[in-house]
Amino acid sequence: MCGIVGAIAERNITPILIEGLKRLEYRGYDSAGVAVFDNEGRLQRCRRVGKVASLEEGLAGTPLLGRLGIAHTRWATHGAPTEGNAHPHFSSDEVAVVHNGIIENHEPLRERLKGLGYVFTSQTDTEVIVHLLHHKLQSIGDLTLALKDAVKELHGAYGLAVISAAQPDRIVAARSGSPLVIGLGLGENFLASDQLALRQVTDRFIYLEEGDIAEIRRDSVRLWDVQGNDVQRETVQYHEGAEAADKGEYRHFMLKEIHEQPSVVQRTLEGRLGQNQVLVESFGPQAAELFAKVRNVQIVACGTSYHAGMVARYWLESLTGIPCQVEVASEFRYRKVAVQPDCLFVTISQSGETADTLAALRNAKELGFLSSVAICNVATSSLVRESDLTLLTQAGPEIGVASTKAFTTQLVALLLLTLGIGQVQKRLADGVEAELVDELRRLPTRLGEALAMNRTVEKVSELFAEKHHTLFLGRGAQFPVALEGALKLKEISYIHAEAYPAGELKHGPLALVDSDMPVVTVAPNNELVEKLKSNLQEVRARGGELVVFADEGAGIEAGEGTHVVGMPHIGDVLSPILYTIPLQLLSYHVAVLKGTDVDQPRNLAKSVTVE
């Protein structure tokens, strides 16, 4: 959600901090700030509500020059988005803190610190941290030791960075439930909540693990684990080009990422398909042994990843006969779970840092699940490190808040998982795996054909320019696709959108249908298409306007109030992946017509690292 950047160097670090914040804008935020230990030996800061550009304007009038500093983009959790609530927070102009996460016991700590004479100027939980650190420093005298002592009193999730005027030779940092990464330079070092913020200055990174404390100086880095032991963490070199953070020829990152889907799906498949079968060892050397034991599957995820899991349930049960449950992580983690025998626990997350999904995985380890598999896009993420097996999607960095290419690559990975389990247990019908492997090889081409309909979808989007409500319908494995389509539309166009199984139309949603409520549906040519046609007739009978993305063989014809976009033919199993594409394009073009911020929609964050 929020973003952290820190730097210590022999040069002016303010431009580095600002550029880092710009690279984190995709995560979503409502205010930004920077604090620098200036060349006169003072801690100075600048904070602004709104975009990083507003912060830049403030710095243009009053430049902050220094060799040590921290910066932050805030997404409000405690306290409104105001300048006073923006980070960094100060204590006595001597200590500055930036913080991602939520301190659950901030209220009793606040009252205690008030009793010690501290005056609070914000409504944030973060201000508790900076005053607590200042208090510890009075008796301890060393910033690193003070932080080690202070975190013992913090309950909740935090990734935080601290600088002090008393010790301007270091940044100290702590990670518990919110990611932090150190960037290594030559005679300079950096800190961020996401390596993307630092790629302009380094390609060498150290990822803090849960409970780690870090002391970052210009020419050294020291780490301590949760037990207080000196530790070394692996240095990871990043090789991917910086073009991922550049829109190139596209107007928005979202449109660029939609059009990248053929290539990222191709990359996700590379090295994972044999001549006629999925290569099970691509999940790891122990995968075959594990897959042989699976009798049940539990999938846990949030948002778009949850919709991917819902599609996987249809695949697992129809292709392998293995029962599968899918649950939202924020619900799973807080209920008493009855674990089925030999149950594989599967998590799905683009970032691998989604707070509820990580917490669910940690809970699962105590509940007796067979093993854990992560479907994730970030190799160095907490989810990957804490799971037994991983299948990495190869979507590359996804900048737009509304997920597109991450979703389709998750679906590909989940189908590979389904086929892998079915293969090992010999549960797949004769010829099915070879047929689906062949279709997977041709999938990037089919996705390209769907993207070629961009102009047609753009024309259809004009129907939504003055609409405020939309209904999405789907049957079978297309119902989660309808859910995803509704989510995309509401996320970026701010049109209220709901999705239902088409068979539920008469059980309530039909009451909403009129000429002002367009109904969007996807119609592959399968055994459910005739039933879907009946649902569409019910909509037209109530004056509802239909937008149908239909297989050429489905027999759905355009007419008054019925707008049909013909889709390339694809087998039923892979159709949820293909039919996602036009719904993404529709949402994008409607949002452009509405004039919304496509890449950074209001109130939303890319990576939800707090509850």
From Swiss-Prot:
Cellular component terms per the entry's GO annotation:
cytosol
Q: What is its EC number?
A: 2.6.1.16
Active-site residue list: 2, 606
Tell me a GO biological process for this protein: protein N-linked glycosylation
Q: Which InterPro entries match?
A: GATase_2_dom, GFAT, GFAT_N, GlmS/AgaS_SIS, GlmS/FrlB_SIS, Ntn_hydrolases_N, SIS_dom, SIS_dom_sf
Where in the cell does this protein reside?
Answer: Cytoplasm
State the oligomer form and interacting partners. Answer: Homodimer.
Q: Which HAMAP family match?
A: GlmS (MF_00164)
Name this protein carries in UniProt: Glutamine--fructose-6-phosphate aminotransferase [isomerizing]
